[in-house]
């Protein structure tokens, strides 16, 4: 029985990658297209003046983007993790691994995650567990990678669509609180593409969480992935569940939103999307599907070249926004229009204030 469970988990990991890459060819809107930065025609800064440094889970890092939780747990995904770690090392950005549950249950799969630290011995690496994993195993996951931080992914919608998924969730909050109190490294709580509302963030802040990844809709859709894995595809009606990355970011502009650090991910397609997310308060921006699709299509070297180009393009966008650094970018005026503006108004967000920031 254990062997069958292990094989099922390995197959699921491989299916997640294959279906995620396929999805990246036709992504849903992230709502970031409804956000327009108000730039300048007379920049105050030169490109060389721009400082992209940001704070990432207590560490100072040179660039405001990272490789988000992706994969691990099978022979095939070991190679992918090695290549992602090489990209992270060469581009000097943090990286999160995918859920380590497979390795915690089957020690023969530990190397499919540890390869990340072997390839990138000095980089910032995030371990990854579900709230289903107890504290002792969570610490094992951290030690497995000599991780610098721990990502706890919350994914009730995915679990409900997954035939073999969890059906009990009421203990998650107390488990997350225990992690916050006992983890030897910083903790970030992350959605998996369904977005966090300000109410969810407030609930997490009340138990001591200091950083969240809003992880909105617009990137990899795990409800669709799990539905596609089902023979009956019985959850077609749930494929649009959740809030977009743009909606999650706008929701955090409410006066009552908790004042904690947040990251943004979900449908980030280009440097302009990164800048928009940073302007709406994110400290850094995560990408998963975009990077793995580039890796599959173009290989490691071309993906590194692409991300190095993004750094230079980010500096140019900061110049256009008249912002020398991320702190100044967060004061740049921006217009919210279209469906996102309607949504923001119903959520009582002061869109006029955003449009007239100084």
UniProtKB/Swiss-Prot annotation:
Cofactor(s) demanded: FMN; NADPH; Mg(2+)
Native source organism of the sequence: Listeria innocua serovar 6a (strain ATCC BAA-680 / CLIP 11262)
Keyword Glycoprotein (UniProt): no
The protein's name in its UniProt record: Isopentenyl-diphosphate delta-isomerase
Quaternary state and interactors: Homooctamer. Dimer of tetramers.
Subcellular location: Cytoplasm
HAMAP family reported for this sequence: Idi_2
Cited function: Involved in the biosynthesis of isoprenoids. Catalyzes the 1,3-allylic rearrangement of the homoallylic substrate isopentenyl (IPP) to its allylic isomer, dimethylallyl diphosphate (DMAPP).
Gene3D superfamilies: Aldolase class I
One of the record's GO cellular component terms: cytoplasm
Sites where the protein binds substrate: 12-13, 158
Enzyme Commission code: 5.3.3.2
Example GO BP: isoprenoid biosynthetic process
Pfam families: FMN_dh (PF01070)
Class of this enzyme: isomerase
High-level lineage: Bacteria, Bacillati, Bacillota, Bacilli, Bacillales
């Amino acid at each position: 029985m254990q062997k069958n469970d292990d094989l099922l988990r390995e197959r699921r990991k491989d299916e997640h990658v294959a279906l995620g890459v396929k999805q990246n060819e036709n992504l849903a809107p992230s709502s970031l297209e409804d956000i327009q930065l108000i730039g300048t025609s007379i920049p105050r800064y030169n490109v060389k003046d721009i400082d992209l440094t940001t704070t990432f889970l207590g560490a100072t890092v040179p660039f405001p983007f990272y490789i988000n939780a992706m994969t691990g747990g099978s022979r095939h995904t070991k190679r992918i993790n090695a290549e992602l770690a090489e990209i992270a090392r060469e581009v000097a950005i943090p990286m999160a691994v995918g859920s380590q549950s497979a390795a915690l249950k089957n020690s023969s799969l530990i190397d499919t995650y540890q390869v990340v630290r072997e390839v990138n011995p000095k980089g910032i690496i995030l371990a990854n567990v579900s709230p289903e994993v107890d504290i002792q195993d969570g610490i094992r996951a951290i030690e497995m990678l000599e991780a610098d931080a721990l990502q706890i992914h919350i994914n009730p919608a995915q679990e409900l669509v997954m035939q073999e998924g969890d059906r009990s969730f009421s203990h998650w909050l107390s488990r997350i609180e225990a992690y916050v109190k006992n983890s030897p490294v910083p903790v970030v709580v992350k959605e998996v593409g369904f977005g966090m509302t300000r109410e969810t963030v407030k609930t997490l802040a009340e138990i001591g969480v200091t950083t969240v990844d809003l992880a909105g809709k617009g990137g990899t859709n795990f409800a669709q992935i799990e539905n596609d894995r089902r023979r009956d595809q019985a959850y077609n009606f749930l494929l649009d569940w959740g809030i977009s990355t743009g909606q999650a970011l706008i929701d955090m502009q409410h006066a009552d939103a908790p004042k904690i650090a947040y990251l943004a991910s979900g449908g980030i397609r280009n440097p302009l999307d990164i800048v928009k997310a940073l302007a709406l308060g994110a400290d850094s921006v995560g990408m998963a599907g975009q990077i793995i699709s580039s890796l599959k299509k173009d290989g490691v070297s071309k993906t590194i070249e692409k991300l190095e180009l993004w750094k230079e393009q980010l500096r140019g966008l900061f110049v256009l926004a008249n912002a020398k650094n991320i702190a100044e970018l967060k004061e740049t005026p921006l217009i919210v229009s279209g469906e996102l503006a309607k949504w923001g108004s119903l959520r009582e967000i002061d869109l006029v204030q955003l449009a007239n920031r100084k």
